[in-house]
Amino acid sequence: KKITINLAPADLPKEGGRYDLPIAVALLAASEQLTASNLEAYELVGELALTGALRGVPGAISSATEAIRAGRNIIVATENAAEVGLISKEGCFIADHLQTVCAFLEGKHALERPLAQDMASPTATADLRDVIGQEQGKRGLEITAAGGHNLLLIGPPGTGKTMLASRLSGILPPLSNEEALESAAILSLVNADTVQKRWQQRPFRSPHHSASLTAMVGGGAIPAPGEISLAHNGILFLDELPEFERRTLDALREPIESGQIHLSRTRAKITYPARFQLIAAMNP
């Protein structure tokens, strides 16, 4: 039997296995193998194995945030439990198999919610007290942190420019819950495994001076966030500033002014947040 599946709207690009679970549930409902009257109240996100087991997908925290904002419940894979649990709101459910999801939708089984113990706590950051001397440099960091300014450190090699820059996050105000969710949502798109470890930590990104323009601002057929977006609500540290390509540095002008980056590619146009403090270091 041939089955045609239509994913609308057709002009939006669709990639990855995140649609496996909703497609499977839709097929079961359309063929009357699943009797559930409240499917419209749920968002379903997850990749299916051949056995019907649910697998985690990137960006689950973004999906959960938007679903809750729209007043709907969301069901994700157990692998995404720690990530979604950071939202700490009602309306999130986790499951490990398609059969479990179907039983829940039919009212025959209860699904677990992400546990509070999945919530991570901030870890200690580098302490400015570790820096001996450099009174002018430390004073500059304090002014930078207080005013949200950008900073250029100039000095000979070995004078502690990198050490000073890495300690700025330790004197910045803690992330609010909204800021922490924004940063976690961006990070989950590229490295979901570290979301819980870095929860409520100010991002600190230090790309090498050989980093390409795409690595810095983001890109790809369906644009992924780059270093400037991964530094959102945190710090972007550019060591050896003159060694970066001219066009890479020019690309930072718009994000510094607007706090976001617009990426236009053939298959998608995406805007990522990119509100960061720029700390640069160079030799005289």
List each language-model region with its residue ranges.
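Peripheral, non-AAA+ core regions of ATP-driven protein-machinery
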Residues: 1-152, 156-163, 264
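Short loop/turn elements that form and flank the Walker-type P-loop nucleotide-binding site
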Residues: 38-39, 69-70, 88-89, 146-148, ...
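P-loop NTPase nucleotide-binding/switch module
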Residues: 109-143, 147, 174-229
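Walker A/P-loop
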Residues: 153-196, 253, 258
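Helical "lid/switch" subdomain of P-loop NTPase nucleotide-binding domains
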Residues: 164, 168, 224-227, 240, ...
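AAA+/SF3 P-loop NTPase mechanochemical coupling elements
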Residues: 204-205, 223-233, 263-283
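Walker B catalytic acidic pair
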Residues: 233, 239-241, 251
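Conserved catalytic/switch belt of AAA+ P-loop NTPases
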Residues: 249-270
